[in-house]
Amino acid sequence: MNRRIRQSKSLNLPTYPGEYIYIPDMLVAIVALANYSSQYDGKYSTTVNMWVERAKKEWIDKETGLVASFLEVYNDSIRIVLPVKGSYSALNCYYLSLVDPEFAKEQYDCLMKNYKQGFPFAGIKEYHDRTCLFGMDIDAGPIIFNLSPSGTAFAIGCATSLDDMEFRNKLLKTAELGGSTVTWFGKSHYLLANLALVGEAIVLAMRTSAPKTRM
């Protein structure tokens, strides 16, 4: 994986052949390389640092200040593809918190500025530039009162990693409203998970995120 990334002029690989580069997917690779490097004498740390620096300099959306959701390779150059989505931005921020906490905090501040919603429910909007009270998004799922279910879940991980406990608690209240915790024989899970199991797994991962474990 490191070899293929370094062989790419953009330091990015497409998730699917012939499609855009999905930045959250690339960040999975970068986090994996960073984790490996932390245990094996920084073996791939140069690649990780190069990628993060390119992201800071070349892949920032001017309007929101956030790392792009999508990139497109065009001839020998690479360009940002709009829109910058709340779900992708929250996931980008979470992964960055595991690689470069300082940059992640900058991204988190931009996420809060452009996508944070406090009323009627705390969460992350999928779109920063338009209202969507009810709709369906191919990435985020059902949009309700502007909120992105995926973005809101991923933001729990951002808030946990970056120690924003005030907003984290508000997000967990929203998750409870949407998921409805039930307890049976000493075990708890979201009732909604009977229909959306992946959502429960994501929330569990996000609320127990590094650097500290909190339930």
Language model features with spans:
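CBM-like carbohydrate-recognition segments
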Residues: A104-M215
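Extended ligand-binding clefts on enzyme/binding-domain cores
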Residues: S8-L11, E19-S150
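Residue-level recognition of well-ordered secondary-structure positions
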Residues: N2, I30-V31, C93, I156, ...
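Intrinsically disordered, low-complexity linker/loop segments enriched in Gly/Pro
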Residues: M1-K9
